[in-house]
């Protein structure tokens, strides 16, 4: 394999070999396992003998690629001001760049060898330093989407003329592009489309006054559209959906139990009748370690989605704000309800979304079902009741 000379770090000699014990990072160990150059031999760094090894050049190339992702030589990016004593924005020494990602990713001997190969005379800076970094760009895209659908244009926001945050940043993400391109791209990359197997147990609760009878699906399943007047995390008033939890406890927490003085909790146990396709935000395929060979150009997507998922399930403490603060998640839900999502390059129609509870992180579900469709997808197997003995929390606390 040919390696281009790199101003950041000189290449190891062709005969240098590295063993698995020298690689601590999960991503580097993954690259080791995928290497076609594995052979028994001695490690050139820790001295281990008769070990499975790979060419050190392969691992070094991966490390260099990750370290230089988003970086550029300062001389190619910045103006040098002699009067001010040098560059006017943040710069990095080569050893700082290497240390930030690699110090705990490899063994001491291998790290020392990498450090010796650095070209100390070069300085580095963030690539396109006057523009947002990739992760920040996605975050600002999300903030812009929230601002637009909450306060500017809700029902035809795709036609809304976006006012750029910075007219000099051509990479800025518009709200429309965020919804239609960036989020679907991240969902496919993170393998969020999953199959929920037939026979899966789910729980759904309802809180009533003591005199109300709840004995069958009609009483605890999706309500009629005429009764759907509240705003929920993924559904606006009038749009019926089926919410459920993975456990009885989280199902109860999601609707405000036990903070219900004198009320009755009805907890329904359901079983899915068919395989269902869901957008699973609770178990995403994030990169392995800092040097996953499949993610070198996409770490910013994974970093953004961790924050994005937290925002999707964040608790809203002020009840008066729910109708407004739920709007972004409602718009996202409606988009995926009608347009589906891609898995392995193929579009898939979705039955619902799996997301972490805002109370304890336990998986919850919202399915795009009304009363009739729910009857074909799930079966009510059991119903239990419980009485609240806890006083209601005074309003405003």
PLM feature spans:
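Active-site and NAD+-binding cores of ADP-ribose-processing enzymes
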Residues: 1-235, 258-397
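A short, exposed loop/beta-hairpin motif centered on an aromatic-Gly-Thr core
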Residues: 238-244
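Short active-site loop/helix that positions an aromatic residue
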Residues: 248-260
């Amino acid at each position: 394999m040919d390696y281009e000379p790199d101003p950041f770090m000189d290449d190891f000699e062709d005969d240098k070999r590295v063993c698995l014990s020298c690689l601590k990072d999960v991503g580097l160990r993954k690259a080791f396992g995928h290497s076609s150059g594995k052979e028994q031999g001695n490690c050139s760094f820790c001295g281990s003998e008769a070990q499975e090894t790979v060419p050190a050049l392969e691992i070094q190339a991966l490390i260099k690629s990750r370290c230089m992702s988003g970086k550029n030589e300062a001389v190619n990016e910045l103006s040098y001001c002699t009067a001010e004593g040098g560059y006017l924005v943040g710069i990095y020494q080569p050893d700082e760049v290497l240390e930030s990602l690699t110090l705990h990713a490899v063994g001491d001997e291998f790290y020392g060898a990498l450090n010796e190969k650095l070209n100390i005379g070069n300085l580095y800076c963030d690539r396109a330093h006057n523009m947002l970094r990739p992760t920040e760009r996605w975050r600002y895209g999300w903030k812009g989407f929230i601002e637009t659908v909450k306060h500017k244009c809700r029902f035809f926001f795709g036609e809304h003329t976006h006012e750029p945050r910075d007219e000099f940043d051509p990479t800025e993400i518009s709200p429309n592009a965020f919804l239609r391109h960036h989020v679907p791209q991240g969902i496919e990359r993170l393998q969020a489309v999953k199959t929920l197997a037939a026979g899966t147990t789910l729980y759904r609760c309802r809180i009533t006054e003591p005199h109300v009878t709840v004995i069958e699906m009609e009483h605890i399943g999706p309500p009629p559209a005429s009764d759907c007047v509240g705003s929920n995390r993924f559904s606006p008033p009038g749009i019926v959906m089926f919410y459920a939890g993975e456990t009885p406890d989280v199902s109860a927490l999601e609707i405000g139990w036990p903070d219900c003085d004198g009320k009755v909790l009805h907890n329904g146990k359901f079983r899915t009748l068919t395989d269902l396709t869901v957008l699973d935000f609770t178990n995403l395929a994030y990169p392995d370690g800092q040097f996953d060979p499949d993610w070198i150009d996409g770490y910013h997507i994974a970093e953004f989605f961790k924050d994005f998922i937290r925002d999707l399930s964040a608790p809203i403490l002020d009840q008066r704000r729910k109708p407004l603060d739920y709007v972004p998640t409602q718009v996202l839900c409606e988009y995926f309800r009608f347009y589906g999502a891609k898995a392995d390059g193929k579009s898939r129609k979705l039955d619902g979304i799996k997301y972490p509870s805002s109370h304890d992180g336990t998986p919850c579900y919202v399915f795009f079902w009304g009363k009739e469709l729910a009857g074909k997808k799930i079966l009510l197997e059991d119903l239990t009741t419980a009485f609240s003995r806890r006083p209601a929390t005074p309003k405003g606390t």
